[in-house]
Amino acid sequence: MCIRDRILVVNTASYCGFTKQYDELQELWDLYKEKGLIVLGVPSNSFNQEKKINSEIKNFCEVNFNINFPLTTITEVKGENAHEIFKWAKENHGKSAVPKWNFHKILINKEGKVEDTYASFTKPMSKKIINRLENIL
């Protein structure tokens, strides 16, 4: 599979200690969208910390974090009911691709392969993520 852009898939939640990472996700999007990075927020209640209505999530993100990167609808990210992208990531990259908590990050390169995964505590603007992005953009 070949895709034009690189994608950072992040499972998000409104009521999590990591929710403040929305700020850095927006910063990352602003810095790299013209270079071919898509930041894709995937709201999920898999860890029971997300609102129940998609429009409320969108409003929360816009009002509190002024985000304008794409958000999906509420999606399961683990287990049997996980969305296909998370099942695919697990099959192609192993257990490290399975979110263990909110704000888990999966970086997909332009060849459509999992480039790397990052745990919740890895901030979007961390050197670890920035260095990897700089190498693949």
Model-derived regions: residue spans:
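Short, surface-exposed acidic-centric catalytic microdomains
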Residues: G36-I38, Q49-N59
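Short histidine/acidic/glycine/proline-rich micro-motifs that form metal-
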Residues: S14-C16, P43-Q49, T75-K78, S120
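Stable alpha-helical elements in mature extracytoplasmic
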Residues: Q21-E24, I53, I57, N81, ...
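Conserved helix-turn-beta segment immediately C-terminal to the redox Cys motif
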Residues: R6, Y15, T19-P43, E62-F65
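Short, internal strand/loop/helix patches
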Residues: S55-N102
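Thiol-/selenol-based redox modules, centered on thioredoxin-like
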Residues: K87, E91-L137
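Conserved small/polar residues in nucleotide/adenosyl-binding loops
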Residues: M1-D5
